């Protein structure tokens, strides 16, 4: 955990970047920073595995590409449902905007963020807690820690932290059920990418340029305001409902069993 402190500090620095007042070549700077964070995360993981003589699978690091794609579709669904509800009830109006090349940068930027945060939150923290505590306690504590990672973000709200914590619990549950962070990475990536690069909403307090330009027609309590969809009471309710459904009807929704993972794993 101590070894990850520099990684988390850099992560906070990156998300505190003012994306509307970008200096020259900001994408190169940000991608390079994220790449450095990713390398640092992989290095700490290597030290952990090597030093403690563990397998990557003990940290839920098992590449399962089908699960990854399912997770991406799952994360996309969250934002589509949010868009449909807010558009239908006149809460947010989504208008097409001019296409920006920023879209391509965000594609890789949010992918790296998803990989880094899932390795740290679910791969390391959840797996460590799982060794000593029950599934519920491990999920609860790791998801709260995941939420607190975003405490220093701009425009943070109680609802925003609650939604992020609930989503962390969901991704942790998915990780325990599949034995891999693959689906959680896909979900995490789509959650941020679709929210920011497509819908044009802020992502955890950071301004984004998307394919759509959202116009807020209601209070921040419903729109999420400057924090993004996570700051919306609507998204919090959606996340909690989906979490309950996934817990109750896992096999019917995903058709994935823990015992099947050895057949799908590609290490």
Please describe what each predicted stretch is:
Residues 194-267:
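C-terminal membrane module of polytopic membrane proteins
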Residues 5-9, 160-220:
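Functionally important transmembrane alpha-helices
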Residues 79-80, 110, 114, 134-151, ...:
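Small-polar-interrupted transmembrane alpha-helices in polytopic inner-membrane proteins
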Residues 8-31, 49-119, 126-131, 259, ...:
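Juxtamembrane helix-loop-helix connectors linking adjacent transmembrane helices
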Residues 32-43, 103-108, 116, 120, ...:
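Membrane-embedded alpha-helical segments of multi-pass membrane proteins
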Residues 116-141, 145, 173-180:
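Membrane-interface helix/loop boundary segments of multi-pass membrane proteins
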Residues 1-8, 38-46, 76-84, 235-250:
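Hydrophobic core of alpha-helical transmembrane segments in multi-pass integral membrane proteins
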Residues 31, 68-73, 103-107, 136-141, ...:
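Hydrophobic alpha-helical transmembrane segments
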């Amino acid at each position: 955990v101590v070894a990850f402190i520099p990684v988390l500090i850099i992560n906070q620095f990156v998300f505190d970047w003012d994306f509307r007042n970008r200096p020259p070549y900001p994408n190169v700077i940000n991608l390079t920073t994220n790449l450095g964070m990713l390398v640092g995360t992989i290095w700490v993981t290597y030290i952990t595995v090597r030093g403690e003589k563990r397998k990557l699978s003990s940290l839920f690091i098992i590449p399962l590409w089908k699960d990854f794609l399912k997770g991406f579709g799952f994360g996309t669904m969250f934002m589509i449902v949010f868009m449909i509800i807010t558009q239908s009830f006149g809460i947010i109006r989504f208008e097409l905007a001019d296409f920006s090349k920023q879209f391509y940068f965000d594609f890789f930027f949010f992918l790296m963020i998803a990989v880094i945060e899932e390795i740290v939150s679910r791969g390391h923290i959840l797996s460590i807690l799982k060794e000593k505590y029950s599934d519920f306690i491990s999920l609860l504590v790791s998801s709260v820690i995941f939420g607190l990672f975003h405490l220093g973000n701009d425009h943070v709200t109680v609802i925003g932290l609650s939604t992020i914590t609930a989503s962390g619990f969901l991704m942790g549950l998915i990780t325990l059920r599949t034995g891999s962070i693959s689906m959680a990475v896909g979900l995490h990536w789509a959650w941020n990418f679709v929210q920011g690069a497509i819908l044009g909403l802020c992502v955890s307090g950071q301004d984004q340029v998307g394919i759509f330009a959202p116009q807020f027609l209601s209070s921040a309590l419903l729109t999420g305001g400057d924090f993004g969809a996570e700051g919306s009471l609507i998204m919090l309710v959606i996340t909690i409902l989906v979490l309950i459904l996934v817990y109750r009807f896992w096999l019917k929704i995903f058709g994935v069993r823990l015992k099947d993972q050895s057949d799908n794993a590609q290490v």
